[in-house]
Amino acid sequence: MAKDLKFSEDARQAMLRGVDKLANAVKVTIGPKGRNVVLDKDYTTPLITNDGVTIAKEIELEDPYENMGAKLVQEVANKTNEIAGDGTTTATVLAQSMIQEGLKNVTSGANPVGLRQGIDKAVQVAIEALHEISQKVENKNEIAQVGAISAADEEIGRYISEAMDKVGNDGVITIEESNGFNTELEVVEGMQFDRGYQSPYMVTDSDKMIAELERPYILVTDKKISSFQDILPLLEQVVQASRPILIVADEVEGDALTNIVLNRMRGTFTAVAVKAPGFGDRRKAMLEDLAILTGAQVITDDLGLELKDASLDMLGTANKVEVTKDHTTVVDGNGDENNIDARVGQIKAQIEETDSEFDKEKLQERLAKLAGGVAVIKVGAASETELKERKLRIEDALNSTRAAVEEGIVAGGGTALVNIYQKVSEIKAEGDVETGVNIVLKALQAPVRQIAENAGLEGSIIVERLKHAEAGVGFNAATNEWVNMLEEGIVDPTKVTRSALQHAASVAAMFLTTEAVVASIPEPENNEQPGMGGMPGMM
């Protein structure tokens, strides 16, 4: 395929048009009075959203040079979303400001490499200043505030706060679509996996069709159990202890399954058999997790252990186990706390190391099951369009809240970026490096300016007053009042603000140092229809 080339100013101006088109579509959503954007979707209803990264991903421009500019800003939004989970609109506004201001200076003869050095130096100081003014998230109320600001909905903030309170900061919180109008929170405490009883005759409550075991022993093995004789010595010890038993095995079948069911029906003992969760290596890891949580020893050939030699001290215990047709939930496993903490640390290290999103998700699930449980926020709405929009807002709010717990919070509404303006302006630099610092200084004001403009106010007036205001005092665009942002609960996670600034600066610096752009020339479409032999006028 042939290529078309543009150089220096032509290339940068063409890309800038693309940057502006994408950024102008995204930045109308920032702030409490930001608007929505409607996205056309093939084969389904249009999506109405104010989520920056969702809008950015949908934009594809016809002109290849403009499209490259738009793709660069998409990268800012994607990277910020990937690392912080929110702040994509702020990142887009910052990137547009740095690119526009930088390009003016490059056109005037500034050296792009010098500008880049100044931008990098300013961002480094800005991030240090952000961490200095950052405050830890101390309580449930502050977590709710972060979620409420991100989603622009206090109810959503409250649900997220309750979910994190129930399952812990490492717990898994999933967002699902509800069949009703109301949004609800459902919490599954303990370790739950997707395997149910192997026979309905094992249930203890025939009305609900569930098996509830109080203080059961738990046998964990990766073996198939076919012969009842293999587990008979162990079951005799369990009967003497007058306690029920949960058997988690690769499979319980044949003679073993028949005898367990018969003895259950006769009332000799209570035993429930379930298949081991997962497959392959993941199954082995999940069995080890269950063993550590309950204090069991995995009976496996790898350790040279046989079922017929198993004793009570190889079994795990829990305060309660509930087994349905499809799920098994182990509540309050009695495993050693130190072993559980060590296992949690090991899984966290694996999450850091893996590049696979799928593996990361599965490891996160395992971590949650060990660390506390799983919370499900079921999103309700009156229409499918509203449901999609609400779900996106809750996802953003959840990511924002996690980021706040991780690195703390700063004054929201763009206030923190203006609060660090003074610190960045003190950088000693000369020439193009100084110009690079000034590019960042102007960008630090851009989010507040845009929030004010979206509220129908003159942005530059708000920015100037904010520069001279006391640290932490900012403009509440929702009420048009000057307030202490932290006291009012108008906060942003430090991680979100930091990531937005870093990624915007990175892409802006790359943009300014671009000297040539290569685009593909599309092949001309062949509209000629093939001839049909044998017909008049045809070949």
Curated annotation (Swiss-Prot):
PROSITE patterns hit by this protein: CHAPERONINS_CPN60 (PS00296)
Binding site for ATP: 29-32, 86-90, 413, 476-478, 492
Subcellular location: Cytoplasm
Pfam families found in the cross-reference section: Cpn60_TCP1 (PF00118)
Major place of residence: cytoplasm
Cellular component GO terms, alphabetical: cytoplasm
UniProt keyword list: ATP-binding, Chaperone, Cytoplasm, Isomerase, Nucleotide-binding, Stress response
Entry EC number(s): 5.6.1.7
MF GO annotations: ATP binding; ATP-dependent protein folding chaperone; isomerase activity; unfolded protein binding
Reaction it catalyzes: ATP + H2O + a folded polypeptide = ADP + phosphate + an unfolded polypeptide
SUPFAM superfamilies, sorted: GroEL apical domain-like, GroEL equatorial domain-like, GroEL-intermediate domain like
Disulfide bonds: none
Coiled-coil intervals, chain numbering: none
GO terms under biological process: protein refolding
Function, in words: Together with its co-chaperonin GroES, plays an essential role in assisting protein folding. The GroEL-GroES system forms a nano-cage that allows encapsulation of the non-native substrate proteins and provides a physical environment optimized to promote and accelerate protein folding.
Subunit structure: Forms a cylinder of 14 subunits composed of two heptameric rings stacked back-to-back. Interacts with the co-chaperonin GroES.
Similarity field: Belongs to the chaperonin (HSP60) family.
Xref: PANTHER family: 60 KDA HEAT SHOCK PROTEIN, MITOCHONDRIAL
Name of the protein this chain belongs to: Chaperonin GroEL
Species the sequence originates in: Staphylococcus epidermidis (strain ATCC 12228 / FDA PCI 1200)
